[in-house]
Amino acid sequence: MLYECVKNKSTIYTFGASHAGILSEELYSRAGGLMLFNPIFGRELMLDSSPITLTSKMERCTGYGKMLAESRADFQSGDVLIVHSVSGRNPVAIEIAAEAKEKKSHVIAVTNLSYSKSVTSRHPSGKRVFELADIILDNHGDIGDACVKISGLEQKVSPTSTVIGAAMLNTIVAELAQKMVDSGIEKPPIFYSANLDG
């Protein structure tokens, strides 16, 4: 799907809110990464927003995802949206995925399928992100994301979604670059580290 998108000169978009947005940052302008990813960033969804509760409020705000999609993306038939949402339940990610689908773009969801299936949608449609996806990449994390149980603590620690998601997507980047070379693209557009000599 991603190779066909590149071959047809279509656009690859990425989106995630709050910590899920770290994967969009990982794919964007990254040493060793491909110059093919177009992130949809919303200032109020970034981790440097204050107060720290703002990102949670904004990702639950019905209508904000549609507005972001309309103002920051130009979804077309054949485009691909990679959307990262661990729970898959919040309106902003659901609406961006729905906007992409409405415009005949493909949707790849990076999510925790067992977590998402254990919660209800916060969007009026009742949908969760995985229900809008053409391809689901399941991070197989624990429900609630944290994975380490410490004696005497009710809340687990050590979330896994970011590191697993980054590993999955960078593996896909490597496979896409290989496919591009195999198809005759001698120099796929790869970022060179700004911290290397030369």
Predicted regions span which residues?
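A short, well-structured juxtamembrane/interface segment
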Residues: 1-8
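Glycine-rich phosphate-binding loops that contact phosphosugars or nucleotide phosphates
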Residues: 7, 13-173
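Internal, active-site/partner-interface "lid" segment
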Residues: 145-149, 178-198
